[in-house]
């Protein structure tokens, strides 16, 4: 048997999950995985069905009340993960952990060493979805163990908004892809979480269904929906539906959608890094191309 390494393309993060395939299964998988969203073209008779196994990754951006950190976290999944950025010096640390209900536990780690190494920081807290906050405690483990510190910390929105946060859930519809393992999303219904009413339907695309990202892509404090519309395995093309608070609707953004590359977010600098030639900074509601190649 052969150990197979699976890459989660949505996060741009390698997940070392051990799958055991026969050589025949591997060859079949490779052949079927070379094409994604455009591999299966629906006909008039292709039924559109509900796709229930889509993972919606909610990425939240929080400032600590002591002004030390910005925590950007993929939540709403069993293994929340993200980055704890330092605000009073350059850099930050990766964090990963577990989520049960609204309770989150995280620990920092060095990606080059792995999760087995002792953490520098641990975070435990409870998320409040209504006001987009997390109350918890941060424990620091310096090299000098005598100086371990524990501090109660309130994490509040990095970019606050006026009024209440929209409470949405998403329902996905599309069709089976006979040449791949994921279905194809052709419609997203935006549901008011409180009233259960459909407030908008997003159409006009073919997206891969393994996961979607719900994050503040244009740094206005509101979460936006990002869909993977890549046709090939390494085709980093995405559709961005940005939330407009004035109209209370999602609008597809052509500027970001025209740039190839997975967006790494740096909320404390209002920057998006999409590829080696595209580092953008949000200035006065507009994107400005930065001359350098890396954010931090």
Language-model region placement:
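N-terminal secretory signal peptides that target proteins for export/translocation
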Residues: 1-17
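Bacterial N-terminal signal peptides
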Residues: 22-32
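Central antiparallel beta-sheet cores of small beta-barrel/beta-sandwich binding domains
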Residues: 42-153, 191-194, 198-205
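Surface-exposed beta-loop interaction hotspot
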Residues: 139-177
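Short glycine/acidic-enriched loop and turn motifs that connect beta-strands
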Residues: 141-143, 231-234
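Acidic/hydrophobic-patterned starts of short beta strands in beta-sheet-rich repeat architectures
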Residues: 169, 218-229
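Repeat-based blade/solenoid architectures
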Residues: 202-211, 259-265
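Short aromatic loop motif centered on NTY/YTY
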Residues: 227-229, 239-240, 249-296
């Amino acid at each position: 048997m052969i150990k197979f390494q699976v890459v989660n393309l949505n996060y741009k993060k390698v997940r070392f999950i051990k799958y055991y395939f026969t050589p025949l299964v591997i060859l079949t998988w490779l052949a079927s995985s070379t094409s994604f969203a455009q591999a299966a073209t629906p006909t008039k008779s292709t039924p559109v069905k509900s796709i229930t196994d889509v993972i919606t990754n909610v990425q939240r951006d929080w400032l600590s009340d002591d002004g030390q950190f910005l925590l950007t976290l993929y939540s709403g999944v069993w293994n929340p993960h993200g980055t704890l950025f330092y605000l009073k010096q350059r850099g930050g640390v990766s964090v990963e952990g577990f989520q049960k209900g609204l309770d989150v536990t995280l620990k920092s780690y060095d990606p080059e060493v792995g999760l087995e190494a002792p953490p520098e920081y641990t975070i435990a807290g409870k998320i409040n979805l209504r006001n987009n906050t997390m109350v918890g405690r941060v424990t620091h483990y310096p090299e000098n163990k005598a100086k371990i510190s524990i501090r109660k910390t309130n994490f509040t929105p990095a970019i606050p908004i006026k009024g209440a946060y929209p409470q949405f859930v998403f329902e996905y519809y599309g069709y089976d892809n006979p040449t791949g393992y994921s279905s194809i999303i052709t419609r997203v219904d935006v549901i008011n979480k409180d009233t259960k009413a459909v407030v908008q339907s997003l159409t006009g695309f073919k997206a891969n269904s393994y996961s979607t990202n719900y994050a503040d892509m244009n740094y206005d404090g509101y979460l936006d929906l990002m869909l993977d519309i890549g046709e090939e395995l390494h085709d980093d093309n995405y559709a961005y539906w940005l939330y407009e608070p004035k109209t209370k609707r999602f609008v597809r953004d052509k500027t970001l959608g025209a740039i190839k590359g997975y967006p790494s977010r740096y909320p404390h600098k209002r920057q998006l890094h999409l590829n080696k030639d595209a580092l953008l900074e949000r200035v006065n509601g507009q994107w400005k191309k930065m001359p350098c190649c890396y954010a931090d």
